[in-house]
Amino acid sequence: VQVVSISSLKGGVGKTSVTTGLASAALAAGIPTLVVDLDPHADASTALGARPGDQQDIGRMLKAPRRARLAENVVPSGWVERASGSGGAPAGLAEAILDVAVGSAYTGIYDRPDLGRRDLRRLSTVLAGAEQYELVLVDCPPSLNGLTRMAWSASDKVVLVAEPGLFSVAGTERTMRAIQLFRQEFAPNLSPAGIVANRVRTGSAEHTFRLAEMESMFGELLLSPHIPEQANWQQIQGAAHSIHHWPGESAKSAAALFDALLANLLNPDGRPAAAQVRDRIHR
């Protein structure tokens, strides 16, 4: 299982959009995936079409992590049924898994800056039951408080989401320093998987300048491809659709970008993306 936290220091940069875009790409590739919605706003759960019944939300599971039964409390994303019924599903999709550990305001009790080591291990303990998945995506709150640190403690990699703007770039630099300090003290095996430039406006001189600044500051940590601003993204999320099953050329182009981004995220050694996806589907 590869656990990846999707983080940002600043709200409004499209962190949850990147999480759901990567989840959509994983579903299209047939990669068994769990999305853990640690943000108390639970926007990822809504966008993924997760409709919980009697299942515990992730906050309740974190309260008693040793007794938490993850497999019994995850909720399947509504995307799976829709994708399976579309008739155009790629090979391997029938067996694909996209589950959600549903978010709730209850997780907010852990979103404080003074969590001790025992509390930081709560998510790691819950995810001990995640062996059926190849990929776990953790949607973090837009802060560096307890929930984000709990996610980092359970993760193999951290992806930072940033808009190419002055304050977002500065926030990303601070977050990179915070990750380095956190690694030294709590999680020596944690690695920054990279930085996703999101909501990029190709015609904006400011965005072009900030992207060049990000390339200079972060080098190879700036992941490719960049994700352009998607005018209908709120409509897609509001309808609880995956980007891969939304009609139109702009959605199709965005889906291809998330396919490439997922391949680069899971495949840092540079093997061709097509081979990477093929290996995962037929493993």
Model-predicted segments: where are they?
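P-loop NTP-binding core
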Residues: V1-R283
